Amino acid sequence: MPKNKKRNAPHRGGGGGGGSGAATSAATTGGPHRTVQPFSDEDASIETMSHCSGYSDPSSFAEDGPEVLDEEGTQEDLEYKLKGLIDLTLDKSAKTRQAALEGVKNALSSKVLYEFVLERRMTLTDSIERCLKKGKSDGQRAAAALASVLCIQLGPGLESEEILKTLGPILKKIICDGTASIQARQTCATCFGVCCFIATDDITELYSTLECLEGIFTKSYLKEKDTNVPCSTPNTVLHISSLLAWTLLLTICPISEVKKKLELHFHKLPSLLSCDDVNMRIAAGESLALLFELARGMESDFFYEDMDSLTQMLRALATDGNKHRAKVDKRKQRSVFRDVLRAVEERDFPTETVKFGPERMYIDSWVKKHTYDTFKEALGSGMQYHLQTNEFLRNVFELGPPVMLDAATLKTMKIPRFERHLYNSAAFKARTKARSKCRDKRADVGEFF
């Protein structure tokens, strides 16, 4: 087609191709139709996620984060929009239901709305249950993601227990269903771990969940019996999510159960370090570091028989220069396994600092890091806001009651933009110098040959 024809051609994105579902959702939310964005800021902030979801019109009002919501609308406006989205979760159109679920999830990730969610938890649970049972892959993923955020909003208690009792058997069925979508099973495994971590009050149910997740990720062990069979398969992403969810639940198990799991998996997990999937290697390495931390917490003189071979394998991964692997994967792997090696050999953990508002949280253990990473994946960019105001998360990380500051106090604490720019520039230079000492420059140069 000639260029002038292309220029004058009508735009196809807005008119008749949107469908009735999108028009209904735009009218319900009370805002103009917006262009669908394939990725959100939340997805961009999570480097280790294996999938990203597209957002339709019902969720577009929450894309700008809590600050924009505070400026553009009151609490009543937000709740009004959420009511419309909750109604759309029961729409006949599958795409509209999916977009509505994602919109509710985005809103609940950005704000703490305990009373609002408490009143409508049954409706939300019914919508999630229906999408998990009858929906396809994308719908099931959206429903499972919303279930995680719903439990985070409510925290531990009877309400979350009821949600887990309703959705738990369905999640378990999808996870173990070999005919279901891998992406849906992966999201359901993460959701099952998060919901069980928050809501379970029955030790038998906790052990049953652990066994369910074990039955998934231990299938990667079988690949190591034959060295000619590659460890990485289409199911690897599911195995990774199951392993990480299993590790999260292990942190709340009684000591007797932890000892049993350590005896069963301590000598099998290292086999996953030779997997050709970098995310599996990293997940296995971080899980091993956490298991060592738990074991040494129970027994200060804990002794691991194959320590020499394990440290040799970890050191090789921390200095990996394999030309057949992507440069980005190698850098990420080397960074993680330097910390894992220090944890196994020296019982050391590099303390991290998380800033949210006027507060700071220090992550000084593998258990705390893994817990933080799990909830960060569920909440995305809303994690900082929830750390400030969500009582459940503040109890998990031992932050105490929420700090209540008025607008005038916050304004006096705000640093001027120019001073922030100078501080960030100085911090950037210092960070660059510090990290340059840890980089293996010779390995990077060798990759070009």
UniProtKB/Swiss-Prot annotation:
Subunit structure: Interacts with PSIP1/LEDGF.
Coiled coil, from the record: none
Gene name of the record: Ifrd1
Composition skew (Low complexity), residue ranges: 22-31
Tissue-by-tissue expression: Expressed at high levels in the embryonic brain in the period related to neuroblast proliferation and differentiation.
Localization in the cell: Cytoplasm; Cell membrane; Nucleus
Signal sequence region: none
Family membership noted in the UniProt record: Belongs to the IFRD family.
Induction cue: By nerve growth factor.
Region annotated Disordered, chain positions: 1-41
Biased composition (Gly residues): 12-21
Protein keywords: Cell membrane, Cytoplasm, Developmental protein, Differentiation, Membrane, Neurogenesis, Nucleus
Physiological role: Probably participates in neurogenesis. Could play a role in regulating gene activity in the proliferative and/or differentiative pathways induced by NGF.
Protein name: Interferon-related developmental regulator 1
